[in-house]
Amino acid sequence: MSLHRDSMVPVNSRLENMDSPILSKICAWGVMLGLFALSLFAMAYACYHKQTSNSCIEEKQGKKQVLKPLDMEPKIVVIMAGNENPTFFAKPTQINA
């Protein structure tokens, strides 16, 4: 700490107040923005990498893929509980009312 030539007020020439809440908030914001930028970069790279690999695969195959029909039956299993073990499996049926 030194005194300014024209005044009697001490002047800090170095950072002595490193435990300031403002400094820690600025550092926290910097870390958060850095992580945000890193995640955006990773997502952009993954998207670009996926698009280029899909175009390479399509060029190598040279034909269109045929879509298989979807199974329209619901995949539901009902387990009827017994005393010690499940007694049987039930398959749901459609009721026409």
From Swiss-Prot:
Membrane topology listed for this record: Single-pass membrane protein
Keywords: Amino-acid transport, Membrane, Transmembrane, Transmembrane helix, Transport
Stretches in topological domain Cytoplasmic: 47-97
Tissue specificity comment: Expressed in the vascular tissues, even in the minor veins of the leaves.
Residue intervals annotated with topology Extracellular: 1-25
Primary localization class, coarse: membrane
PANTHER family reported in the protein's UniProt record: PROTEIN GLUTAMINE DUMPER 4-RELATED, PROTEIN GLUTAMINE DUMPER 7
Family: Belongs to the GLUTAMINE DUMPER 1 (TC 9.B.60) family.
Swiss-Prot/TrEMBL domain comment: The VIMAG motif is necessary for the function of the protein.
Protein name (database record): Protein GLUTAMINE DUMPER 7
Lineage: Eukaryota, Viridiplantae, Streptophyta, Embryophyta, Tracheophyta
Gene designation per UniProt: GDU7
